[in-house]
A protein has these predicted regions:
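A short aromatic-anchored loop/beta-hairpin motif
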Residues: 37-145
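N-terminal export leaders
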Residues: 15-33
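Beta-strand elements within well-structured catalytic alpha/beta cores of enzymes
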Residues: 52-56, 86-91, 176, 197-210, ...
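Internal, conserved structured core segments that host functional sites
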Residues: 133-188, 193
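Short, basic/glycine-rich phosphate-binding loops at helix/coil junctions
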Residues: 54-55, 112-119, 166-175, 252
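Surface-exposed, charge/polar-rich loops and edge strands
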Residues: 172, 182, 195-203, 212-307
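N-terminal secretory signal peptides
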Residues: 1-14
Length: 307
């Protein structure tokens, strides 16, 4: 039997507070058609030029439908570069044994949370998928045997941010899963194999949160505009220093960086997407931080644009 995804799905009985706490070979005719389609895709990719790389702090699922400074940051950042030919998103909310990429034509919108307003569950983000990009990604990666997934779709780590960037859902989106059996350095090295996609107009997005400790959320500060515990602010400051200095080794070896990092990253899934984004950076590229705030004590929304 195929390995089932180890996702971050939450019971529908959870309320919002609990969520935060818990939170090929073809016939000749077919081949001709395929080549024509690939030519169109290649033409489109060539026209966009090299894409930047993003890490987006996605925060609460409510950011999908709320108008706040964080979604404004996503929107404004998307306006600073050309519309991509496609998006490849590495989301904190899709963990599997082995690495998968979504390969369907039309990925479903996954509402992988519970206890939120009906309005949030009614959101659909009907962006097309890209089987061609999924196959190209599979062929690029030599570090692992990439599986082609036909069941997952777009989880809220992807659609809750991308819908603000491309509200018309007119950019193809695929997701890549996080192999929960592998160490951080493995993820970093795998990400480096994706660099050629940037040259083909693919926007690669890591979606998570640098500091993400739901067990230590400050309940009395949930509605504060900005609040971070001292340890969260200290860990965030060190992370940002390493990022801006292009010093990735301590970020990869985060478990050896002391108590503040241990509190900031109690589990790896929201942090690992950052390593994917950093691995794709080049020495001469500009690095910009935005949405740089701590919320609810133990979460940061800090996001990164590279290139």
């Amino acid at each position: 039997l195929p390995e089932q995804p180890k996702s971050n799905l939450l019971s529908n009985s959870l309320n919002r507070t609990q969520f935060i706490q818990a939170i090929s070979f073809l016939p000749l005719t077919g081949l001709t058609m395929k080549l024509e389609g690939l030519k169109k895709m290649t033409d489109s990719l060539e026209s966009t030029g090299k894409m930047p790389v993003l890490f987006l702090g996605h925060g609460s699922p409510m950011n999908a439908i709320e108008e706040n400074e964080f979604v404004q940051g996503f929107r404004k950042t998307a306006q600073t570069f050309e519309k991509p030919a496609a998006v490849l998103c590495i989301s904190a909310h899709w963990e599997t044994r082995g690495t998968q990429v979504t390969a369907m034509d039309f990925p479903r919108t996954i509402h992988d949370f519970g206890g939120f307003p009906k309005e949030l569950f009614e959101v659909q983000y009907p962006a097309p998928g890209s089987p061609d990009l999924a196959h190209e990604t599979k062929n690029l990666v030599q570090k692992a045997e990439i599986g082609l997934d036909e069941k997952w779709g777009l989880d809220h780590g992807a659609w809750s941010v991308i819908r603000h960037m491309y509200p018309d859902a007119d950019v193809p989106v695929i997701q890549m899963s996080l192999d929960y059996t592998k160490p951080p350095v493995w993820h970093y090295e795998l990400a480096k194999e994706l660099v050629k996609l940037r040259e083909k107009g693919v926007l690669i997005i890591g979606s998570g949160n640098m500091v993400h400790n739901l067990r230590r959320v400050a309940w009395n500060k949930l509605n504060a505009e900005e609040f971070g515990y001292d340890w969260a602010i200290e860990a965030s400051a060190k992370m940002k220093e390493f990022i801006l200095d292009r010093n990735h080794k301590p970020l990869i070896d985060y478990s050896s960086q002391g108590k503040t990092f241990q509190l900031a990253i109690p589990t790896p899934e929201h942090y690992l997407p950052l390593l994917y984004s950093l691995a794709l950076s080049e020495n001469n590229e500009e690095i910009l931080l935005f949405n740089d705030k701590a919320v609810a004590g133990s979460l940061t929304m800090t996001s990164v644009k590279i290139g």
